[in-house]
Amino acid sequence: MKFIRETKDGAVILLYVQPKAKKNEIEGVDEWRGRLKVKIKAPPVEGKANKEVVRFFSKMLGTEVEIIRGGTSREKDLLVKGFSSKEVLKKLGL
């Protein structure tokens, strides 16, 4: 899958984030962007949406995650520490 890759530190998920949504959810894969589309309730103000993305994926995956690129963009790269891409896909149900 184009939206996930492996590094020495873990798996990196390529995200496209839509802030100010009705609920936090994974909407699916944006084939054109090659990213996983995620809806987040928090607004893109003062890092609130970024914190919500980290909290959402940490809870879903049960491990520490970190935004490594795209802090001020809708396109973000999220590092899932210590997990392979296969493990991440399984936990996300993809």
Swiss-Prot record:
Belongs to the UPF0235 family. Signal peptide: none annotated. It comes from the Archaea. It holds the Pfam family DUF167. The lineage of its organism: Archaea, Methanobacteriati, Methanobacteriota, Thermococci, Thermococcales. This is UPF0235 protein TON_0641. GO terms for cellular component: cytoplasm. SUPFAM superfamilies: YggU-like. It comes from Thermococcus onnurineus (strain NA1).
